[in-house]
């Protein structure tokens, strides 16, 4: 074999590998997202239950499911065929009117299990068509307009530069659970 000169240290090598992996992940996510959006963007179903069998690597299911949920403005169950049913990931979008989508999924008679967080969890269903019917009936009166909880409303004419600068002092505290102020 030939000797190749080492032109990067271990840190540079790790960064290069991680960027390569992230690029591969992004390409797989985006390809699947486009496929599923074209199949589901006109659906009137209250929950998008999407069969990803043969289309998406299971490692990317959660990434694609949350992107679909945000774009479709409805909860998503992105699953693939397994031995006795379908398994995958459940996701609901920020400000979804269903506060605990996992618990609702767990109460569906077609659910084998739903485990994880209220809006991001693993799921297994027996029959996706029966589950789709159940969700449509259960959520028939629910509007999926985003719901924003507010502490107070400020009229535009009452906003000053000093007030904005005061809020800006707290920007490092905004995170999940402590939302940035909406304007």
Question: Which positions does each model-derived feature cover?
Answer:
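Hydrophobic helix-and-loop "lid/oligomerization" segment in the mid-to-C-terminal part
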Residues: 1-133, 137-139, 153-158
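A contiguous loop/helix-start segment that scaffolds small-molecule binding in enzyme catalytic cores
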Residues: 141-183
């Amino acid at each position: 074999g030939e000797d190749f000169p080492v032109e990067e240290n271990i840190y540079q090598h790790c960064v290069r590998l991680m960027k390569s992996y992230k690029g591969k992940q992004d390409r797989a996510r985006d390809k699947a997202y486009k496929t599923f959006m074209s199949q589901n963007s006109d659906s009137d179903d209250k929950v998008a239950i999407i069969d990803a069998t043969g289309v998406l690597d299971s490692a990317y299911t959660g990434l694609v499911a949350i992107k679909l949920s945000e774009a479709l403005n409805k909860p998503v169950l992105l699953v693939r065929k397994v031995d006795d049913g379908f398994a995958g990931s459940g996701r609901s979008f920020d400000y979804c009117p269903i506060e605990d989508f996992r618990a609702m999924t767990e109460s569906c008679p077609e659910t084998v299990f739903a485990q994880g967080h209220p809006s991001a969890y693993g799921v297994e269903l027996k029959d996706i068509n029966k589950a789709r019917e159940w969700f449509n009936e259960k959520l028939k009166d629910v509007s999926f307009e985003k719901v924003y909880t507010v502490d107070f409303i400020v009229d535009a004419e009452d906003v000053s530069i000093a007030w904005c600068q005061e809020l800006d002092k707290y920007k490092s505290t905004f995170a999940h659970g402590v939302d940035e102020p909406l304007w």
